[in-house]
Amino acid sequence: MEAAMRRYAELGVHTLKTGYAGGFKGGYLHHSQYGVQHYQRVVETVAKYRIMLDVHKPIKETGIRRTWPNMMTREGARGMEWNAWSEGNSAEYLTTQPFVRMLSGPMDYTPGIFDIDYSTAKADKGRIEWNGPNAECCIKTTLARQIANWVIIYSPLQMAADLIENYEGHPAFRFFRDFDADCDWSKALQGEIGDYIVVARRAKDRHFLGAGTDEKARTLVQKLDFLEPGVTYTATIYADAPDAGRNPEAYLIGKRAVTARDTIRIEMAERGGQAITFIPAEK
């Protein structure tokens, strides 16, 4: 491991994403003494070479990231990939995790999939094996909710996990370009466990809002008093289209000028959501 990390550093590698889907040799469990000692050794070794860690299949959060801040984020939950070969993760699941798993720290869920029904995957015969015998697997949320999850599911290192061809030229990809994962302020604005959630975050002078619902369509009213008083922002809204309940890839993008005195309506389709970027307007 030492030699590998040294070589990564020489090559200018600053971030490492590890995974243990195959388990440990010898049949050791992740939370065994062997597993815990291994994780600790990895964190300390990569820190020597100033490499940041994103761990999938981790042990539970213990607060280690406060001692070793290079331990940037971790999965530690049923991640996005489960939608590819199983019944998938429900919208209710995604409105539960912010109240449960995320209390322990950042979560790398890898949200942001645009190919909701895997139409690209269905066209590739090589992918049928992991996508079910009839390629019936799919993402259980709308496209707008996939974007909103970048705000809802906090991780200081985010990954746009879909295929490049599904993002290329897509208007909604603008959100990822405008988003700053290095947030310095966060607040849960409203929500009910397993039903819905609205979260606001701030990075420098930009604010972001993410809202999501379960399998029930909802309309919420939200004050924007978390914005900086006296500043006019351009709000870019990524919302569910009226038919998103039947066509989850249907979305709308709108813009409006807002201030901290304004109130907005957040209309979400079943399994839907809404994401908003608030960028100070140019004077």
Regions found by a protein language model. Give the residues of each.
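Aromatic- and carboxylate-enriched substrate-binding clefts and catalytic-loop regions
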Residues: 1-137
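Generic beta-strand/beta-sheet core signal
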Residues: 16-21, 54-56, 210-214, 238, ...
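Conserved, mostly hydrophobic/aromatic
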Residues: 53, 152, 209, 271
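Catalytic cores of secreted or luminal carbohydrate-active enzymes
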Residues: 144-188, 277
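Carbohydrate-binding surface patches
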Residues: 192-229, 274-275
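Solvent-exposed beta-hairpin/edge-strand motifs
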Residues: 227-241
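Solvent-exposed beta-strand/loop surfaces of large extracellular or lumenal domains
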Residues: 237-261
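C-terminal beta-strand-rich structural cap/linker in extracellular carbohydrate-active enzymes
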Residues: 255-283
